[in-house]
Amino acid sequence: MVYLVHQNEWRSVWVKTLAKLNKNVLINISYHGTKFHGYAVQNDYETVQSKLQDALAWIYESKIYVNASGRTDKGVHAINQYISFYIDDRISLEKLREILNRYGQNKWYIKWIKEVDRNFHARFSAKAKTYLYLIDYCANNPLFYDHAWIVNFQLDFNLIEKAIPILEGTHNFWSFSTADKDKGLRTIHKIDLKQEDNKVYIYITGDGFLRSMVRMIVGALYNIGIKKYDLNHLKWLLDNPKKGRAITKAPASGLYLYEVYYE
């Protein structure tokens, strides 16, 4: 593993006796999804969680487990991910942010770190999340290949807008998930659709999401937009939940964790 921070600088923050980890902190972090093999720790692969925990272990000489607002799959980006963990007082929060950003080697950027209540948990304290999905018609520009779903033809925007109210509200979304068990009851508060130039922005806000749920919802809207199936079929998918029944899963490259909401 390559470190951008010189080892002597790391040693300057060490202490001979490990202090009690008594400070609960929250970070706001953005990252490029294609630089990691997802968020959660996986053997033999670099993930956001593993790299962050390695950095904290190096600084604090102790295993520190971090908790994110939610996991992101390989290739999925984060504009505003939130991660909480316990540390001690050996260095300031601003110094910690600076060191972690250098350790990230331009794969992530930590915007801020702040102390939070000891009972705060990045995942369990979250009330809602917004995901952004980006579709781009600019198929000849390779700069966008890792940042959007490249589509070679125009979608029927009016049909997609008509499909949105069907998906909003509380439903069993198991047909829009790759989860093995039927725990599909979720509430989508709002879906916003915006088209600018050659790009389509889909914002989906809900109280929680199943595995692959956002990507399969986008896949369903795509199928509506190309007239592969109609609005009645979309209703049928909700009324007859079964794992993966919606079939089409939009590419990870277009998905962004946009915001997480706390009280």
UniProtKB/Swiss-Prot annotation:
GO terms for molecular function: RNA binding; tRNA pseudouridine(38-40) synthase activity. InterPro entries: PsdUridine_synth_cat_dom_sf, PsdUridine_synth_TruA, PsdUridine_synth_TruA_a/b_dom, PsdUridine_synth_TruA_C, TruA/RsuA/RluB/E/F_N. It holds the Pfam family PseudoU_synth_1. Substrate binds at Y131. It catalyses: uridine(38/39/40) in tRNA = pseudouridine(38/39/40) in tRNA. The active site is at D73. It comes from the Bacteria. The keyword DNA-binding does not apply. Keywords: Isomerase, tRNA processing. Its EC number is 5.4.99.12. GO terms for biological process: tRNA pseudouridine synthesis. Belongs to the tRNA pseudouridine synthase TruA family. Homodimer. PANTHER family: PSEUDOURIDYLATE SYNTHASE, TRNA PSEUDOURIDINE SYNTHASE-LIKE 1. Formation of pseudouridine at positions 38, 39 and 40 in the anticodon stem and loop of transfer RNAs. This is tRNA pseudouridine synthase A. It comes from Mycoplasmoides gallisepticum (strain R(low / passage 15 / clone 2)) (Mycoplasma gallisepticum).
